[in-house]
């Protein structure tokens, strides 16, 4: 079993374990906290000269029709989600005018769903395969283990696909070219 969401993925549990000198595996406090904060993760990615979709960070109170129209003029397709969350909670993908109009019509309802979240991340939608790379740190060196392709029965790897049997397939090794596979491994440890 694994811990998810606040306290499970944001470094708080690791902080308690470390304070009480209880050994644990997986990510440390700093890594967990950084990865749970999407905008901070993206800034770190950009700082390290890695590619990342364009994004905007908004206070949830500033999320309105006017702001979304401005963003849509810059990002034709986009993903909107809480800045600090996991498990694909609260994600909406906007790929066409109908989906955009639906978001605008239901913006107050969407904001209520995310009432525990102060910040919203809106990022450019990029279609393609969903890949993930497992890494491990041994003797102070990070090693990339393998590239996995994730195929969801739903539109994306959402909460249901992550936690319901039969909604996603994990293909290992990922079905990509040798060059792309190698590049994924290199990028994971950069």
Can you annotate each of these PLM segments?
Residues 183, 187-190:
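C-terminal active-site/capping subdomain that shapes the small-molecule cofactor and substrate pocket
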Residues 1-59:
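Conserved N-proximal alpha/beta basic substrate-recognition cap immediately N-terminal to
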Residues 34-128:
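Active-site nucleotide/adenylate-binding loops and adjacent lid/helix of ATP-dependent enzymes
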Residues 26, 88-89, 168-172:
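Short small-residue beta-strand/loop micro-motif enriched in glycine and branched aliphatics
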Residues 95-179, 183:
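Phosphate-binding site of ATP-dependent enzymes
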């Amino acid at each position: 079993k694994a811990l998810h969401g606040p306290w499970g993925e944001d470094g708080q549990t690791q902080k308690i374990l470390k304070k009480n000198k209880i050994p644990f595996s997986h990510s440390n406090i700093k890594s967990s906290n950084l990865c749970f904060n999407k905008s901070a993760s993206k800034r770190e990615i950009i700082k390290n000269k890695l590619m990342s979709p364009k994004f905007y960070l908004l206070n949830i109170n500033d999320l309105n029709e006017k702001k979304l129209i401005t963003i849509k003029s810059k990002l034709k397709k986009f993903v909107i989600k809480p800045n600090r969350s996991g498990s694909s909670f609260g994600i909406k993908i906007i790929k066409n005018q109908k989906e955009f109009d639906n978001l605008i019509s239901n913006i107050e309802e969407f904001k209520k769903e995310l009432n525990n979240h102060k910040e919203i991340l809106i990022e450019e939608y990029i279609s393609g395969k969903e890949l993930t790379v497992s890494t491990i740190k041994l003797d102070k060196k990070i090693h990339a283990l393998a590239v996995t392709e994730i195929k969801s029965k739903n539109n994306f790897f959402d909460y249901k696909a992550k936690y319901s049997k039969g909604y996603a397939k994990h293909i290992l090794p990922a079905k990509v070219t040798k060059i792309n596979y190698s590049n994924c491994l290199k990028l994971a440890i950069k």
